[in-house]
Amino acid sequence: FDVIKYQQKRLGTKKGFIAVKPNCSIQSYTPALAAWKEFGPKELVVTTYQAISGAGKTFKDWPEMEGNIIPYIGGEEEKSEQEPLRLFGKVVDGKIEKATAPLITTQCIRVPVLDGHTAAVFVNFEKKPTKEEIIDRWENFKGLPQELNLPSAPKQFIRCLLYTSDAADE
């Protein structure tokens, strides 16, 4: 909320503000990274698998997409590499100063799914956490909505579901 007071001053208003949401493909994994902040994520390799709804399409108006993938989505990789750094940055004199880490490398792929994006994320840390620490930080992570006890906020923001190869076969 730090940027809002600067925005209101610039716009000459005491109420209201302009809010933007992050790129849809990064929303699935940036909260998980925030939960691991103490371990110092230093490098990410991310592959996103983005549904056709992200392009504003349906299978009815994009039938050639059925059964196909597009291995490059123009502009998405740049956004996916830069926008998390803005989210992890800080407000200095009313402007967002991007974080300098982690170094993010992305590949964004359009897949023949109507709705929903998926991300495969590989992380290298400054301080390597144990599996138990990773799960604990996810299970106990509280975002700002939880801290403010907002009525629409889920009690547990991140849920960790563990699957073994045996469970996947069932």
Which residue stretches match the model-derived regions?
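Short amphipathic alpha-helices in soluble, non-transmembrane regions
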Residues: E133-F141
